Design a protein with these regions (language model features):
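Long Lys/Arg-rich low-complexity intrinsically disordered regions in nucleic-acid-associated proteins
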Residues: 1-342
């Protein structure tokens, strides 16, 4: 056998001979040491062992994998091997392998045709098993989830800019509270037809008749001094939903302040669907996002994330998680997640 032999030392596999040319320069494995020697991270060494491109004394692929104490190692290996098979070069996100290793990521994936020698990054990659719990605020770049059958599903994660050009509404208006909604008996024409607040009592075609407002819509208008009612909308909202109402109200207000119209997402299984550029009720445009409102410290399982992303994708939208506190005045954190095909 002509394959170089490595030795395990301080948690890495060191390989000499022509290792730099053979592994790093030509295929993006490892990191250079002195001369032609390189260090391989365990996941890189495992992949080369499996392919028969490396020898380690008295060890084969099964014994090497079983000897790694990190319980998440094999999940990371499956993702590493999958991306290698797809033609990508990637490096472990650790000191010595990449400059400024990204927090919460396990790999740095490079653009096709690029590798660790030029640091042309495609994305930072977080790896998780399907039974893990993930803090949404720690997600960025891309996420790879390995399910119980060892299949890998990829998601892209970003922080969207929420902005639109929809019309506002400022005419003083009166409403009556009725259980968990409000009714504007004599609404200004612009309330529904231009600003897209509420629903006409007798159907969408009758924009000048009585308008039903959700408690969120009514609370937002009341807070801005536009709507007056015969009772406290906030108190009613808290009675109906507790802290969840105030979190949803914070997100609703943030959308409206950015020129975006949020409407109920109930029929899609979400909190909101949103419209960025409403010119009139007859020209709504496409609803780009489905929005789920969650507490700032919320953790989700990969299964829950996958369900939400699949739900949004099925109706040609993208899922946004809005992380908001209940009535503390802080801005929501927006996290968008979608399917990714490497």
């Amino acid at each position: 056998m002509n394959e170089p032999q490595g030795r395990i030392e301080n948690g890495v596999v060191r390989v000499g001979g022509d290792a730099r040319q053979r592994y790093y320069d030509s295929r993006g494995y490892g990191r250079p040491l002195d001369g032609n020697e390189i260090a391989l991270a365990p996941v890189e060494a495992a992949h080369l062992l499996y392919r028969g491109d490396l020898r380690i004394e008295d060890m084969d692929f099964p014994s090497f994998v079983q000897g790694v104490e990190d319980p998440s190692f094999f999940v990371r290996y499956l993702v590493y091997a999958d991306l290698r098979e797809r033609g990508f070069y990637l490096s472990p996100a650790r000191e010595g392998w990449v400059p400024d290793p990204p927090a919460e990521a396990q790999f740095v994936v490079y653009e096709r045709g690029s590798g660790p020698w030029d640091d042309d990054r495609l994305y930072d990659l977080r790896v998780a098993g399907e039974r893990e719990s993930l803090s949404l605020t720690t997600l960025h770049g891309a996420l790879a989830v390995v399910d119980e059958e060892s299949e890998v599903t990829y998601f892209e994660v970003d922080r969207p800019e929420i902005e639109g050009s929809s019309a506002g509404f400022s005419k003083p208006t009166e409403a009556d509270l009725l259980a968990d909604r409000a009714i504007v008996w004599n609404p200004p024409h612009e309330l529904f037809s231009a600003a897209f607040y509420g629903q006409p009592l007798s159907g969408r075609e009758d924009g000048d008749g009585p308008i039903q407002l959700s408690l969120l819509e009514a609370a937002y208008l009341a807070d801005r001094g536009v709507l007056s009612t015969d009772g406290s909308i906030l108190e009613r909202g808290r009675e109906v939903e507790g802290d969840r109402f105030e979190r949803r109200l914070a997100v609703y207000a943030a959308f409206r302040e950015r020129g975006v119209v949020p409407k109920t997402g109930f029929k899609f299984g979400a909190d909101f669907r949103v419209y960025a550029d409403v010119e009139s009720i007859d020209d709504l445009g496409h609803s780009e996002y489905l929005v789920r409102v969650l507490p700032p410290d919320c953790a989700r399982s990969p299964r829950e994330i996958a369900l939400d992303v699949r739900l949004a994708h099925g109706v040609r939208k993208r899922m946004v998680f809005a992380l908001a506190s209940a009535n503390d005045g802080t801005e929501p954190t927006w996290i968008s997640v979608g399917r990714l095909t490497p």
